[in-house]
Amino acid sequence: TRLYQAHKEAAAKATVLTAIMPDATGYGRVIRSAAGTVEKIVEEKDATEAERQEKEVNSGIYCFEAQDLFSALAEVGCDNAQGEYYLPDVLAILRQRGEKIWALAAENYEETIGVNSRLQLASAEKILRHRKNLALMESGVTLMDPDTTFIDTDVSVGKDTVIYPFTWIEGASSVGEGCVLGPSSRFSDTQIGHEVTAQFVYAHECEIGDGTIVGPYVHLRPQTKLAAQVRVGNFVEVKNSSIGEGAKLPHLQYIGDCDMGSGVNMGCGTITVNYDGKAKYRTIIGNDAFIGCNSNLVAPVTVGDGAYVAAGSTITKDVPSKNLAVARARQKNIPDWPDKRQ
């Protein structure tokens, strides 16, 4: 809008948006006359050493009178270091015709930076990341180290949330209030409730309920839904599963294709066996079930409400509500074994 207004007010045939760059390397330079009017724009490869010292650069954004633009384009040649047709040559052609050329400097050079290399892309991303982080901190979010915190532009974060270094929050993600996230975590397309604690976590296309604690070293795969007050501890992977309110998965579990009720306790080393080599099947665990350590739940299988599974069991049949399932060989102790094996 500013460029268009300046163009009309100046009654110019062409107006170019320029910027004063701290480092103008790689940009076309704006060359002005002693009176300050724009004479031409010269690409860096075609510029003289004196012209390369100029800090005012061409943003590549113009406002033209259409009739004059198309007339001048017919005269543009390719006699330059690149052998290309340069649009900025139109300005010199119009000036030679005695037409008025105008320039407007951008208020912030960062708005006009070009991206022609991986280095420039990284620089542009850093600028946008800094703006996002600044806005979050001004809204009440604590970033322990903004330089190592990466939050996409469209991500919303609630006030009083604390984010530790090396944390990525990207895509269609959102974070509630009063959370503690990171360090070294990545949340992609994930919705995080209020007062969630998550450290050393990778979550993709997930939902994490209020007051839930996740990590360290947890992988939440797509279609995982953790209800409120869930505990997912060390070295746990959850995939395509819904975990009920207050359930505990404290350590060393694989939970895949599972519908788990509220108040469930999963013992260390317990897994859902969801794949038979051809198809995947679901495991259903009722409310307040207690699954002992080192157990295998071979899907399709259902463990009823309030049921118990003894440690070390491999469960292949449904366990009715409030039943205890024991599926392991009886222990046999052989006395004086060292003597007998001789």
Name the predicted role of every residue range.
Residues 39-130, 134:
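Catalytic-core segments of class I nucleotidyltransferases/pyrophosphorylases
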Residues 30-33, 63-64, 115-116, 152, ...:
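Short beta-strand-to-turn element immediately C-terminal to the catalytic PLP-Schiff-base lysine
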Residues 58-61, 153, 281, 299:
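Glycine/small-residue-rich pyrophosphate-binding loop that anchors the diphosphate of NDP-sugar donors
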Residues 189-342:
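Glycine-rich hexapeptide-repeat left-handed beta-helix
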Residues 9-14, 25-27, 35-38, 58-59, ...:
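Short coil/turn connectors at secondary-structure junctions
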Residues 17-18, 41, 104, 318:
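Generic beta-sheet signal
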Residues 95-200, 208-213:
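Extended, small-residue-rich solenoid/repeat segments and analogous flexible loops
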